């Protein structure tokens, strides 16, 4: 019964934030902070007391650490079916942690309609948790689409204009909504197609994940349905050429919106590939894998090159996310257990490091009232602590040994090399470009000639706690990743078996 509460807690907390605004602007902030702290606490309890050696695998009835199922719309085979395994647990822990940080980083930034802001923030996070737990495909789609509306309001009502003043927050919010809504509708068509094909074969109308895993699909039909899922996840990840909504959304979003977008919402797409696209359509995924990995490779370099050209610090970080998610895509489709686990570590590490960089850019904006790096420079001695901490996270983002980013990228490249050596070698050179745009960001913002001589306010206790906590977690993930690898091992083993057997069949057919 605890699984429904993981979803309900953010929704209830959001309503309480909205209702609590009549008693002052401070109460909604504390309610939101307690709500996300409770979610994180329950996640840690489940991690400490759960058996995460159970996970779905081909040829066996899916087994889960925790499962909850009740009938919802019986006539159409729709149920409220939730389940938890190692992968979904790690994603929920990331959601809880970044949820706490998104509340803290908006503590002073958001001054208008504070209750409604936190209602939207909590409902985004509730929808994300629903995505990570839902096994009924209709329920999964419901939560997938439900995240969009509160994120639209978050950007449209509390966002900023672009640094050059040409793009408004309404433009960015609308572009985000259209991209993700259109791709979601494509996935809905694919879900309905899968359900109908299974119904024609078995005579059973169901949206249940376990039943649809057994669906017998003609090769051409499987490929088309897989593409429907892939496009939806590729837009959210994002994969080039479906990425253009991301820089605008990040640049115009409030800091909390950027933290949730980069840290959590992008990970729902990678999770969707691992949970649904590969296991439901293994043969089509194996056939499509070279194309997917090539798209990942393009994303690594395209994101890096566009990051070079940015003057808005948040747009630079956004394009770096496109580059980092290219490594995740290669790891997912490589068919290697090592690379798959590396993709999970990279998802966690990128969530932490990107969230920290967006929090730091938000703190810069509060002091300078600009995100344009051409108007910065010479800040190293003008702001206490912030430049040095920014340098650490920039180094972590480029894969500094001893941080989780290094472990994730190393495992992806080592695991992929045995299967796709030419893609891996080219992707490795992308790390060089990653170091260049990270150092460009630091040089433009903190070094060079100072634009003014005034000393700016240093970081206060709240700001230091947020980023130092993320730094410690990144180092723990880099120095001792074994607990995270053990937690996700069973799930990734199952995904590897689905994809590996499909690769074997594809090779023998040729």
Task: For every predicted segment, state its role.
Residues 25-37, 171-183, 386, 461-469:
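Alpha-helical transmembrane segments and their helix-start/interface "positive-inside/aromatic belt" motifs
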Residues 1-2, 16-119, 206, 211:
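Transmembrane helix-loop-helix hairpins at membrane boundaries of multipass inner-membrane proteins
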């Amino acid at each position: 019964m605890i699984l429904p509460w993981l979803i309900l807690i953010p929704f209830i907390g959001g309503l309480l934030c909205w209702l609590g605004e009549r008693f002052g602007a401070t109460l909604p902030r504390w309610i939101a902070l307690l709500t996300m702290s409770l979610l994180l606490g329950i996640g840690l309890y489940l991690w400490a007391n759960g058996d995460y050696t159970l996970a779905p695998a081909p040829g066996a009835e899916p087994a889960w650490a925790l499962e909850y199922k009740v009938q919802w719309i019986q006539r159409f085979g729709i149920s409220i079916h939730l389940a938890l395994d190692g992968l979904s647990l790690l994603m929920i822990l990331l959601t809880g942690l970044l949820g706490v940080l998104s509340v803290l980083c908006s503590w002073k930034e958001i001054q208008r309609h504070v209750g409604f802001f936190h209602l939207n923030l909590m409902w985004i996070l509730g929808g994300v948790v629903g995505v990570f737990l839902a096994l009924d495909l209709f329920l999964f789609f419901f939560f997938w689409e439900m995240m969009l509306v509160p994120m639209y309001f978050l950007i449209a009502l509390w966002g900023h204009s672009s640094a050059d003043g040409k793009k408004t927050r309404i433009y960015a919010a609308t572009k985000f909504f259209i991209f993700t809504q259109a791709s979601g509708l494509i996935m809905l068509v694919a879900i309905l197609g899968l359900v109908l094909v299974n119904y024609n074969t078995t005579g059973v109308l169901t949206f249940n994940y376990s039943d649809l895993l057994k669906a017998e699909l003609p090769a051409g039909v499987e490929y088309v349905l897989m593409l429907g899922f892939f496009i939806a996840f590729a837009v959210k990840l994002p994969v080039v050429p479906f990425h253009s909504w991301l820089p605008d959304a990040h640049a115009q979003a409030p800091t909390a919106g950027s933290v949730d977008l980069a840290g959590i919402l992008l990970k729902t797409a990678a999770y969707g590939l691992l949970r649904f696209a590969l296991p439901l359509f293994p043969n089509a995924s194996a056939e499509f894998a070279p194309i997917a990995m090539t798209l990942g490779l393009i994303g690594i370099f395209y994101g890096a090159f566009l990051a070079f050209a940015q003057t808005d610090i948040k747009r630079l970080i956004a394009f770096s996310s496109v580059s980092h998610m290219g490594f995740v895509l290669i790891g997912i489709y490589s068919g290697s257990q090592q690379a798959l686990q590396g993709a999970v570590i990279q998802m966690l590490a990128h969530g932490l490091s990107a969230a920290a960089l967006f929090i730091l850019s938000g703190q810069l904006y509060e002091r300078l009232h600009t995100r344009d790096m051409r108007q910065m420079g010479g800040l190293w001695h003008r702001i206490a602590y912030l430049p040095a901490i920014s340098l650490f996270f920039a180094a972590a983002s480029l894969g500094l040994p001893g941080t989780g980013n290094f472990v994730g990228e190393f495992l992806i490249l080592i695991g992929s090399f045995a299967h796709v050596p030419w893609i891996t070698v080219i992707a490795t050179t992308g790390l060089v470009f990653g170091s260049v745009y990270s150092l460009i960001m630091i040089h433009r913002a903190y070094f060079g000639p100072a634009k003014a001589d005034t000393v700016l306010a240093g970081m206060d206790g709240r700001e230091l706690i947020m980023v130092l906590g993320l730094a410690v977690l990144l180092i723990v993930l880099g120095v001792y990743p074994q607990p995270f690898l053990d937690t996700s091992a069973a799930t990734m083993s199952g995904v590897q078996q689905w994809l590996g057997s499909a690769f074997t069949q594809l090779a023998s057919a040729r």
